[in-house]
């Protein structure tokens, strides 16, 4: 369900064959290096690397997101535009009638092969997105995990309770 909205509304989504052609020779080396890091320092070393990557993502995109202002939708779009510049083919789509949330969809992932072996990298990216957007985001799918796109759910508003409305529970 999470990626279906993105698939229907995305500008471009790379096919599996395209991902192979877009991949570079560094993926295998990076996976082996992270595997070796894990052998030497255990899971903590890989987690430390992922945390450093999260901080790097925050540093790279913080000025762009900050300059976008305070509107969460505009901030999410600024992040998507910056990610697209870096090869992630990112888009933002309203869900739920455009009132409560958007989805950040990434149609390509330059580190997909490495992240398939080390999902901590996807977790680090998700953490960075939440910090950048200053909301609790939720990753719904990843290319590395077999999804058609990476999809991140971003709440952008709170439900409005109409005056006089009652919260009634039925038993």
Language model regions located:
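Residue-level recognition of well-ordered beta-strand positions that form the cores
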Residues: 13, 105, 153-155
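Short, small-residue-biased leader/transition segments that mark boundaries at the very start
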Residues: 1-7
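Short beta-strand "wing" residues that participate in macromolecule-binding interfaces
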Residues: 3, 14, 139
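Short intrinsically disordered coil segments
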Residues: 27-29, 119-122, 164-171
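Short, charged/polar, Gly/Pro-enriched secondary-structure boundary elements
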Residues: 17-22, 111-113, 157-164
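Mid-protein regulatory/catalytic core that forms ligand/cofactor-binding pockets
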Residues: 39, 43-151
